[in-house]
Each structure stands twice: as C-alpha cells, then as structure tokens.
Amino acid sequence: MIVVIKTILSVLMSVTCVVTSGIFGNYAGDFSPVDEETVKLTFATISDTHFTNSKIRAAMLELGLYDMEHAETPLDALVFVGDNTDHGYIEQYELLKNTVAKYTPAKNILMAVGNHDTWTEDENGEDSPELVKEYFTKYASEITGRNIDELYYTAEINGYTFIFLGSESTHTSAYISPAQIEWLDNELSKAAGKGKPVFVISHWPINGSHGLPGTWGDEKDPEPDTGGFGEQSDEIEAILKKYDDIFLISGHIHSGFTSPGQESVFGYLSVESEGTFHSINLPSYMYMSQRGRVSNGTGYVIEVYDDKVLVRARSYSASVWYTLYDYEIPLSTAQTTCE
C-alpha cells in the first residue's frame, strides 16, 4: 500500500515540481548527499510525530520511513526530536515502535523526549514523572537499539557527538535540572575538544528564538510558557555559546520552513546563527505547519562536511526536496584550518 501511495504522490509531485519549482524550489531528485565523495555524516531529522493509536498517523510516518529507507545513499541516522507520542501512553509507544520496525530508515535511530511524551498519567489520572521516565527509556531503547536509561543522554555516530536534552517535569515548557545543566556543560566540553560540530537535540528551542513567543501559544497550559526552555533558557544558551560549532536542533512550535529571505514576511527563520552557534527548528511532521511553508511530512536532512554543514529541507512523505529553504553553514574549525 505504501508503494502505491508513493507512486501516486511521485507522479503528482513531478507535475507539481514543474509548475512550482521556480516559486518553492521543489526538486524531486535523488535522495542522496550533495557530494557523496566528501560527506562525513548524513542524518534525517523529524519532530512532533504525535502518535496516538491512529493507523492513519502510522501510515503518514510510514511514507517518510519508506522514503528514508530508499535513499540512494543510506542515511547514517534518523533523529526523532520529541513529541513522538501524543500523551506518552503505552499503546502509542507500541504503535510507534511497530511502525518504525517495518523499515530500516537509517543505520542508527536516535530519539529525544518532548512535552507530549511527559503527559503520562498513572491509574488515578495523575501526572506521573516516574512513568514518563519508565516508558520513554523503555521504548526509546527498544526503538533505537541503544541502552537509554535517562531522559538525557549522549550518542556518537561517525565520530560526531549528539547530546540529547530532556525535560524533567510534566509541563509544556521544559524543566532542565541543575544536574542536567552541569552534565550538558561537561559533555559539550568533552565533545568540543574533537574539533568537530556537536549536535544538541532538544524538543524545546531557546526562549526568544525562531519568532518566540509570538510563534507560540498554549491556552490549555496554566503555567507561564514561552514556547522554549523556560526559566533555564538563558543559562542553557550561555553554555551552548561557550563552544564552537554547536548546532541546536529543536521542534515544538510547529512552524513551517522559511528561507533566509523570508524573516520580514513571517517574523522568524527556520535556521538562526549567532557566531558559531546555530539553531535549527523543525516543522511538525504529523500536523500541518501553522506558518511559513504550509505542509506536513517534512523535516531537515543534515549533511556534514569538513568545512560546512548543509541543512536541506525535505518532504519525506512526498519524496521531494524544498531547495528554497536550504541553508549552508560554514564551520569555524575549517576556517581556522584554512588560515
């Protein structure tokens, strides 16, 4: 069924690309790196899959997993950037696990926790941080094939460090404990010594980034909420900016792709840089974007080279590149070497 759907979408998108390529930069070319000879790391990122027990949502994710599995050059990793489930329930995690297990989307799979994943309730209908940790670590371990025993952890792929942050509360905004903040600083210090870019994965972006708080609003949450890290945001931002070539990859706010020239139109950019710190915000995979490029089934493919990082917008569900929303980011380590 997925093959049939993909075939139909491929035909439709081929026609669409001819009509709209000059407007949106749609390109239905090979799913492969720009330069296969020199690329060091390639990974797909998606956020906000919001799994329920719906087979329709499972089918939507299958479109993307199929696209990744059939990439001309196998991906080094697929990274889930939180809100993997809608409420952190066992049946939601089970469906997600079983859906992912049908495919081999990448050589590695990694997963961050999001606020929706922390809304697990006990038998009395009360929020349960204990069950949040139990369910997330269990299913993240089973889905990724890694031994994950905390809401935050570090992984390494092709010699590149991935640092995953996780909220330790059940609120919409994140709570990053002092212990986790200290751990983050230590992990960044170790990783920065390698002279390679470091990827910090957090469902929540930094307060004030990517158009926040104007691009965020949650009337159901009684707690003050900025759409970002919350009260610890400034401290986390300062730590991230202590080191060179740090890439923060987030989701959460369900904003669509924007290109470098569209900040004045939409009030935010999908990729923001300050010095050698770079913040990448992903659209929601499952839901239609609330602003920017209106679509779903999308995410960024990250390609790492010796001298740069390419951030490439892709519709995984339609197997199409959205080249208008691509970014190229030079690495400071390469610049230093060139001098």
Identify the function of each model-found stretch.
Residues M1-N26:
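Gram-positive cell-envelope targeting signals
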Residues E37, G292-R293, G297-E339:
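A short C-terminal boundary segment appended to hydrolase-like catalytic domains
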Residues K40-N53, G159-S169, F199-H203, F277-S284, ...:
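Active-site-proximal beta-strand elements of phosphoester/diester hydrolases
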Residues F43-L63, T85-G88, W119-G145, H171-A174, ...:
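Acidic/histidine-rich helix-loop elements
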Residues T45-S47, L78-D83, I109-N115, L165, ...:
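Active-site neighborhood of phospho(di)ester-bond hydrolases with catalytic His/Asp-centered motifs
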Residues I90-K194, E235-K242, T258-Y287, V294-Y305, ...:
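Extended active-site neighborhood of metal-dependent phosphoesterases/phosphodiesterases
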Residues Y175-S177, A191-S250:
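Active-site-proximal segments of metal-dependent phosphoesterases and phosphodiesterases across multiple
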